[in-house]
Curated annotation (Swiss-Prot):
Binding site for DNA: 312, 317
Organism whose genome encodes this protein: Gemmatimonas aurantiaca (strain DSM 14586 / JCM 11422 / NBRC 100505 / T-27)
Biological processes annotated in GO: DNA recombination; DNA repair
Annotated binding of Mg(2+), by residue: 68
Similarity comment: Belongs to the RuvB family.
Subunit structure: Homohexamer. Forms an RuvA(8)-RuvB(12)-Holliday junction (HJ) complex. HJ DNA is sandwiched between 2 RuvA tetramers; dsDNA enters through RuvA and exits via RuvB. An RuvB hexamer assembles on each DNA strand where it exits the tetramer. Each RuvB hexamer is contacted by two RuvA subunits (via domain III) on 2 adjacent RuvB subunits; this complex drives branch migration. In the full resolvosome a probable DNA-RuvA(4)-RuvB(12)-RuvC(2) complex forms which resolves the HJ.
Organism phylogeny: Bacteria, Pseudomonadati, Gemmatimonadota, Gemmatimonadia, Gemmatimonadales
Predominant location category: cytoplasm
Catalytic activity: ATP + H2O = ADP + phosphate + H(+)
Function (record text): The RuvA-RuvB-RuvC complex processes Holliday junction (HJ) DNA during genetic recombination and DNA repair, while the RuvA-RuvB complex plays an important role in the rescue of blocked DNA replication forks via replication fork reversal (RFR). RuvA specifically binds to HJ cruciform DNA, conferring on it an open structure. The RuvB hexamer acts as an ATP-dependent pump, pulling dsDNA into and through the RuvAB complex. RuvB forms 2 homohexamers on either side of HJ DNA bound by 1 or 2 RuvA tetramers; 4 subunits per hexamer contact DNA at a time.
EC number(s) recorded for this UniProt protein: 3.6.4.-
Region (Large ATPase domain (RuvB-L)): 1-183
Amino-acid positions noted as binding ATP in the UniProt annotation, renumbered to this chain: 22-23, 64, 67-69, 130-132, 173, 183, 220
Protein name per its UniProtKB record: Holliday junction branch migration complex subunit RuvB
Origin: domain of life: Bacteria
């Protein structure tokens, strides 16, 4: 694992098995996002009372905040099956026929990265979501014909990091839409302690706090940092995680006390040193640091904006006075000032 991957909120191969073992079994066990949890609890209770499927749900927000976990919990709470797929995996309408026709009454179909659905697949979904009916194409060419087929009533749960990329017709078909935000340190501490118990890690409260506050408001990052600090503790600190052990381990990984890593520093330094603090366009900035524009926009920018290091303006990205000071530069007169949220 590279140092840049340590703090990425994107799921890595090594995360998959661990996240499954840490996933809560009931909605009440889900930590954080209290307003979303309360709203979901009401929706689920109402659907059970009416003996109806829950309205189609859409979760949006940065990666690593629990969208997939919530889809799993919705199915568990309702006692129904969960079918999982993703936007990039669906290349043609026929790829959805098998999942949709195999659904039973009330089952949940989860589509991750739903903003990456092709237009033809979106249109195929419309009748499935509204009328619980799909049109199956039986042949191509002059003999082509479609046959309508009814399917069981189901709940579609979509997840996206890019709400603005969803078409208006698709968004309008979701009855429940929730934004997942970055987690406060207090919630992340609870998550770190719970993960430590599951992994049988010896850790004091200060050690858990130190990991939590450097986790970029993201549970996935918190759990990954805990595993790396555990490695350090087992090799160099008799297996016990204290504040001092966590500080030493995270310093070795180039994760500072705000949770910023090497890539964050490169991005902010490029804006300050190469573009006089900005504004600078996304594509230009990406070329300057050798990173994909989509990765910058989806993975790095949300936290930097929320934490007050970066501003998005109509003319481009601007480094804030806080970014200047954090990197040891003197902010220019009139530089953007944006307080952090954590």
């Amino acid at each position: 694992m590279s140092r840049a991957e340590i703090t990425t909120p994107e799921v890595l191969t090594e995360d998959t098995a661990v996240e499954l073992s840490l996933r809560p079994q009931r909605l009440a066990e889900f930590i954080g996002q209290s307003r979303v949890k309360e709203s979901l609890t009401i929706a689920l209770d109402a659907a059970r009372a009416r003996k109806e499927p829950v309205d189609h749900l859409l979760f949006f927000g940065p990666p690593g905040l629990g969208k997939t976990t919530l889809a799993d919990l919705i199915a568990r709470e309702l006692g129904v099956n969960l079918t999982v797929t993703s936007g990039p995996a669906l290349e043609k309408p026929g790829d959805l026929v098998a999942p949709l026709t195999s659904l039973r009454e009330g089952d949940v179909l989860f589509i991750d990265e739903i903003h990456r659905l092709r237009p033809v697949i979106e249109e195929f979904l419309y009748s499935a979501m509204e009328d619980y009916r799909i049109d199956i194409r039986l042949a191509d060419g002059p003999n082509a014909r479609t046959v309508p087929m009814n399917i069981e009533r189901f709940t579609l749960v979509g997840a996206t990091t890019r709400l603005g990329m969803l078409t208006a017709p698709l968004r309008a078909r979701f009855g429940i839409v929730h934004q997942l935000g970055f987690y406060p340190v207090e919630d992340l501490e609870v998550i770190v302690r719970r993960t430590g118990e599951v992994l049988r890690v010896e850790m004091d409260a200060d050690g858990a706090h130190e990991i939590a506050r450097r986790s970029r408001g993201t549970p996935r990052v918190a759990n990954r940092l805990l595993r790396r600090v555990r490695d350090y503790a087992e090799v160099r600190a008799n297996g016990r995680i204290t504040r001092e052990v966590a500080e030493a381990a995270l310093a070795l990984l180039d994760v500072d006390h705000f949770g910023l890593d090497d890539m964050d520093g490169r991005l902010l330094r490029a804006i300050i040193e190469k573009f006089e603090g900005g504004p600078v366009g996304l594509s230009t900035m990406a070329a300057a640091i050798g990173e994909d524009p989509g990765t910058i926009e989806e993975v790095y920018e949300p936290f930097l904006v929320q934490h007050g290091f970066l501003q998005r303006t109509p003319r481009g990205r601007v480094a804030t006075a806080r970014a200047y000071r954090h990197l040891g530069f003197v902010p220019p007169v009139g530089s953007a000032e944006q307080p952090g949220l954590f």
